[in-house]
Every structure is written in C-alpha cells, then in structure tokens.
Amino acid sequence: MTTSIDAQYEQYLNAGLTLDLTRGKPCSDQLDLSCALEDMIGGNFKTTDGIDARNYGGLLGIPEARALGGTLLDVDPKYIMAGGNSSLTLMYQFLVWRLKAWQANNPSQTFKFICVVPGYDRHFTICEHLGIEMLSVGFDNAGPNMTEIEALVRQDQNIKGIWCVPKHSNPTGHTYSEATVKRLANLPNLASKDFVLMWDNAYAAHDLDPQTMRHQTGQRSCRQGVL
C-alpha cells in the first residue's frame, strides 16, 4: 500500500534535484570576502618561523594561525594546534586515538560518553560510529546538569568523556556559567582515569551582546591543578 507521503517522497526522488543542505556552509559571495587576504601578504608566503606556507609545514600548524587562536581563546599559543578548516575532523581523529588507548587496556569493554542534550548531532554521530555508548544529560539554567554528570562520572569508570559546547550551545543557546565551567574542569579528578572534555567552543566569537561572559580557559584550570 502506497501512502501519500510515499508518493511525495518518490516525487522528490524522481525530480533529479541536486541540493546541498549542509549546515553552516558559506555561500560563494561570503567566500569572496576573503579573496583580498592573499593580496594583503603581497606574495610573501613565509611564516614567522621561516616556512613557506604553500609547502608542507610542522605538525602544530602555522605560527600566525596559532597566535590568532591563542588570542581568540585566551590561551598561550604554545598550547594551540592549528589544523585544517574542519574542527570536526580533528575531534574525530583525537577520539580515534584515545579509543585505541582505552581498548588496549580493556579490549572487550564498551566505553561511554556523556552527551548534553539537545546538542550537536555530529558529535553524537562520532560516538555512534566508534561504538561509544552515549549517556544523555539535560540542561539547567547554568548549563549542563552538573549534579547528575558528577554522579555518573563517580559511579562508572567506563565513562571517558563529555561533549561540551560552552557558549551559545546549539539549539538552546545556553552559555555555561563560570561555576559550571569550573565543575566541568574538575571532572577528570572525579573519574577513574583518562577522562577527556571535548570542548567544542565553536561560538566563542559569536557574541551579539558585548556583555556576554568570557569563560575561564582550560589552560588556566590546568595551571590551577584542576585538569
């Protein structure tokens, strides 16, 4: 039996449409805004450490890009790695690397991640693809429900991390409070070992209100012995 929805679906399939519904992808007009950037450097492609940026570079990335990242994130550039234009690729590669280490000690164990919901579906797709079990935790006014998260981390040594979008979290728009950020930074101290915070600060520079809170950085938490 064919329903009207099935018929409508088949109609779209047969229309031969080639639509790109990728979220967050700039249009050509937006990309054209960056055309003048190459002209600004006047053909000088040498980085501050003397590498020709058109050639292969070091593993940590272009120094100028790392310095810019340090400014944007309020982190010492020596703690910054500048990759390609896909942060999601870096996150995936990092978790593949960590998962291999976890599995080396417990090859038959299923590892878990805390996922603050609603959240970014592609974070969750990475977990699904890697066979990482997802534990959903909701929000309160200050961000993720930290009481529930802390209890989970204390109880289960197979919980290895948490996904965080600390500012203007999509789709709810939550910005984590300073107290919540500090409690998140302390989670590795509550876990059995090797707990990671996947800190996807994608909207760090997207404040519409100039009074939006600046977070204490992970680097500062490290220096305080929290992480």
Q: Each PLM stretch: what is its role?
A:
Residues 1-60, 64-65, 70-71:
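N-terminal "arm"/small-domain region of PLP-dependent enzymes with the aminotransferase-like
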Residues 51-193, 204-224:
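Conserved core of the PLP fold type I
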Residues 198-199:
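Generic enzyme active-site microenvironment
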Residues 227:
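PLP-dependent aminotransferase class I/II
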